[in-house]
From Swiss-Prot:
This is Peroxiredoxin-4. It is an enzyme of class 1 (oxidoreductase). InterPro entries: AhpC/TSA, Peroxiredoxin, Peroxiredoxin_C, Thioredoxin-like_sf, Thioredoxin_domain. Coiled coil: none annotated.
Length: 259
């Protein structure tokens, strides 16, 4: 009888102690475990201790954003090429520079002016060893309808560059240009080199169209630095004086341009 009474008292004491345990603050979650980040498109889950002393999964995306000198995210999708549907991928452009530009939507306002301007400059890009690809979240059918619409009606009226379809929005998200609240992309441009590395990232807010001349200038400047190992100062254009990136070389440059 005494043993049973003693056991009951111990149990009662334990219950009282449990009731008086100070809860973990909701502002101070106990960190339990973090999985190492990866560049996989899958999410990683971290385990935290919540204010009820219970384990809970917190899931968030760990896809790294594109970075300069890092590999461009692989892509594959249906495109309209020379009026035909065709699957294209990043692998198709190995050994070449690729200027991949995103625009918000087909049948809009600034977008056709950009695409036509890039299309008109396609030969100059090709002479510099660079291919052009435009991309939006529209379907390939919408792309084709827009291409076949006369320019005087706001269409493209035939173009010399592929238009890639990103219906799932995955390519746009991988390249960091998708705006969730808008449901489409901003004007993002990515220059990828022959090794598949990202070399230039530019982003315009949607009211402002891009400069094709600046895209060509930057492409030629990068090609020059890749080939000759010298650097290009501000506003450098093909044929301008470049600079050796060392104290002696920079002094020679500054003396030459400041006579």
């Amino acid at each position: 009888m005494r043993s049973a009474t003693k056991l009951f008292k111990n149990l009662s004491k334990s219950v009282v102690q449990l009731k008086t345990v100070k809860p973990v603050s909701s502002l101070n979650f106990g960190y339990i475990k973090t999985r190492q980040f990866s560049t996989s498109t899958t999410d990683s889950s971290n385990l935290f201790l919540n204010n009820n002393n219970q384990f809970q999964n917190f899931t968030f995306p760990t896809k790294q954003q594109i970075r300069i000198r890092k590999p461009a995210p692989a892509f594959k999708g249906q495109a309209v090429v020379n009026g035909e549907f065709k699957e294209i991928s990043l692998d198709d452009y190995k050994g070449k520079y690729l200027y991949l530009f995103f625009y918000p939507l087909d049948f809009t306002f600034v977008c056709p002016t950009e695409i036509i301007a890039f299309s008109n400059a396609a030969e100059e890009f090709k002479k510099a060893g660079c291919e052009l690809v435009g991309c939006s979240i529209d379907s390939p059918f919408t792309h084709l309808a827009w291409i076949n619409t006369p320019r005087k009606e706001g269409g493209l009226g035939g173009i010399n560059i592929p238009l890639l379809s990103d219906l799932t929005h995955q390519i746009s998200k991988d390249y960091g240009v998708y705006i969730e609240e808008d449901g489409h992309t901003i004007r993002g441009s990515i220059l990828i080199d022959k090794e598949g590395l990202v070399r230039v990232i530019t982003m315009n807010d949607n009211p402002v169209g891009r400069s094709v001349d600046e895209a060509i200038r930057t492409l030629k400047a990068l090609k020059f630095t890749d080939q000759f190992g010298e650097v290009c100062p501000a506003n450098w254009s093909e044929g301008d004086k470049s600079m050796k990136a060392d104290p002696k070389g920079s002094k020679e440059y500054f003396e030459a341009v400041n006579k």
